Amino acid sequence: MKKHYLFFVSVAYSYPILRPLQDEIRRRGDEVAWFIEPDCPVLLNQDERWLQSVQEVMDYQPIAVFAPGNYIYDFFPGVKVSLFHGYPINKRGDEKDDHFSVRGWFDVYCTQGETSTLPFKELERKYGFFKVYETGWCKADTFVKERAHTPHNARPVVLYSSTFTKNITSAPHLFDTIKRLVREKNWDWIISFHPKFSDMEVLKKYKELAASCPNITFHESGLVDAKLLNSADVLLSDASSVIVEAMMLDKPVVTYCNTMPGAHLLNVTETDAVEGAIEKAISRPAELMEQMRAYVHKHEAHLDGESSSRVLDAVNNYIWY
């Protein structure tokens, strides 16, 4: 008898996180359906099943419900599984990272590496009502596959992706610098903003710049996936968790006013230092790359393409043992 699984989508960036898991569920001969919150865009493919009501979910009777977001409906059938929507990089620089907030929604947490597993194991011992399994992140499976298809760009490609957090985003501060570099340097650009980015005035400025410059591609959806990251040579960002994702693809990262800087990235605090940092990143200095790879391993310990398989095994272990 086929097992039924459900994906709970409350944020648009859930789609690229969940699809590798969907592939593994189907590979095992089981079934998966999607439940999408009303205020979340529906970005399903034709072959993906959409349950549009609570009654449909009840009739479907999933054995497990997976959510990359911070909450889930506790009255849905099945084990509630947290997959996370990023890595615990503590972008706000707080003493307490809200990545580790236990809200009482989940039975299982599927952690990624030592930076998430160790704190959640402590929380498991403290609360006792959930289990923690280090599986790796489902989305990381796509990065493993994508690395085999790294393009060789004729000109350096810079991907600019900023966080949506208002007091951290670099977007208002870097516009003039990016505008100048687009016109002066022999680089191509991709610009992408987080789906939650809400400053429409700033967004409009970047869109207008992209429309006026042939060497800029504006990525409308804001969903940064492995293919988009792999198309670039360098990531320019601030404190977004996409930083770790770029590094998983061996892409050096330049940040503006990063809240947790370190030797794994090229962080600048002045706009006039951005150009030199990008040039250095393009050259891929050996020490930077070594530090970057060590940093990635702390966050994602399982870059083997099998994280989705381990997630399903963890659910089976929780249910049957």
Put a short name on every predicted segment.
Residues 31-45, 182-221:
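Catalytic donor nucleotide-activated moiety binding site of glycosyltransferases and closely related
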Residues 14-26, 138-206, 268, 303, ...:
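Conserved catalytic-core segment of nucleotide-activated headgroup transferases in glycan assembly
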Residues 6-146:
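Active-site and donor-binding regions of nucleotide-sugar-utilizing enzymes
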Residues 103, 239-303:
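Catalytic binding pocket for nucleotide-activated donors in carbohydrate/polymer assembly enzymes
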Residues 302-321:
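C-terminal alpha-helical cap of glycosyltransferases
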